[in-house]
Regions:
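Pyridoxal 5′-phosphate
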Residues: 1-379
């Protein structure tokens, strides 16, 4: 089997991830709910995960990191906690439904939303950000990298635009956290949402968000916090402000271990390997007859994703053939990002997405490219 569906979830985790989770299950209590060793051990696990993520993302402190069940919950927390009826939000057609559906709900409640479009290659039309600005514009939310095309958003441009006009910038880093260097302070990001089970190498059921110090938002969920139990309102200090109830401590043990492994290897080195594998695959298939590749490959700095179609062949059928005949795991369909498919004309066909990890080998990539070329030749 060749696993090239890493944009959905990374399959191969470092051994330390499972070991950390097993240790938690055998020795940890409930963090913040006592003073005995098992609960203190759990608290140390949670803090370790915060600390490693703060280091990876160059956050001001571990307290800037709040945990959720996934990036979808993190994005809901940010958007629903910051946007009010009458506010205007600027976003893009590249977004995942984890951004779109919260915005649609907020629109039903009185918010307004504008969508920056893409050109025929899938690249954002950055001039439209200024075009869509209104007196009531409050927030900009963008994906760091499209989960469909792999194209990166120019965060330096978007951040400068947001800062110029006093807007809050929320970034969906589902495809980039752990896969490339990110410095939230240098980028001027106000909120950065991440998932644990992709490039951060943690287990499913983990995620969270970085929140810039001084930025406050209404919590999505309130309840048990382990502190200030006689107060009628949920605690307002970070990270407790955005965390209600018992955290997924086994998952956070694995996430902390995964991020620590990334830091030990160097995120720059891992990113360079993924970039090289992606470029190798692209160069081997770019001239295959009838193969249409989506996204811009003029620049090598992009997410490790190559999405394509074989002529008019249904993407789901092509993915089935890749699995059944070649043992290659890929993702086909709309990838939960409907607007980019509308923009690129692939609503009915979908796309076949290959996504790479530093865990993949050059031999695997070459075999996958060979399979693509064979299928293309067969027509």
């Amino acid at each position: 089997m060749i696993y090239l569906d890493n944009a959905a979830t990374t399959l191969q985790k470092p051994p330390c991830v499972g070991q950390a989770m097993l240790d938690e299950l055998e020795h940890a209590g409930n963090p913040g709910r006592g003073a005995h060793e098992p609960t203190l051990h759990a608290a140390r696990i949670v803090y370790h995960a915060r600390e490693t993520l703060a280091t990876l993302l160059h956050a001001e402190s571990p307290d800037c990191i709040a945990f959720t069940a996934n990036v979808t919950q993190a994005l809901n927390t940010a958007l629903c906690g910051l946007v009010r009826p009458g506010d205007h939000v600027i976003t893009t057609v590249c977004e995942h439904n984890s951004v779109l559906r919260p915005l649609y709900r907020l629109r039903e409640q009185g918010a307004e939303v504008s969508f920056v479009e893409v050109d025929d290659t899938g690249r954002l039309r950055y001039e439209q950000f200024e075009k869509f600005l209104r007196p009531n514009t409050r927030l900009v939310v963008v994906t760091h990298a499209s989960n469909v095309t792999g194209d990166l958003t120019d965060l330096a441009f978007v951040s400068a635009f947001a800062k110029k006009h006093g807007l809050t910038l929320v970034v969906d880093a589902a495809q980039t956290a752990g896969a490339r260097p990110i410095d939230v302070q240098a980028l001027g990001v106000d909120v950065l949402c991440f998932t644990g089970h992709k490039a951060l190498l943690g287990p499913q059921g983990t995620g969270g968000l970085y929140v810039r110090p001084g930025l406050t938002m209404a919590p999505l969920v309130v309840g048990g916090s382990g502190i200030h139990s006689f107060d009628e309102t949920h605690p307002s200090q970070m990270p407790t402000a955005l965390e209600a109830g018992t955290l997924n401590v086994p998952g956070l043990a694995g996430l902390g271990a995964g991020v620590e492994w990334i830091l030990s290897q160097g995120v720059e080195a891992l990113h360079e390997k993924e970039t090289a594998l992606t470029r190798l695959f692209y160069e081997k298939i770019v001239h295959a007859p009838g193969v249409k590749i989506y996204g811009s490959f003029d620049e090598t700095d992009r997410a490790p994703i190559v999405s394509l179609n074989f002529g008019d062949e249904d993407a789901a059928r092509a993915a089935d053939i890749l699995w059944e005949d070649y043992g290659i795991c890929v993702r086909a369909g709309a990838h939960c990002a409907p607007l980019i498919h509308k923009a690129l004309g692939t609503v009915e066909q979908g796309m076949v997405r290959f996504s790479f990890s530093h865990q993949n080998t050059e031999a695997e990539v070459l075999k996958a490219a060979e399979a693509v070329c064979e299928l293309a030749e067969e027509g």
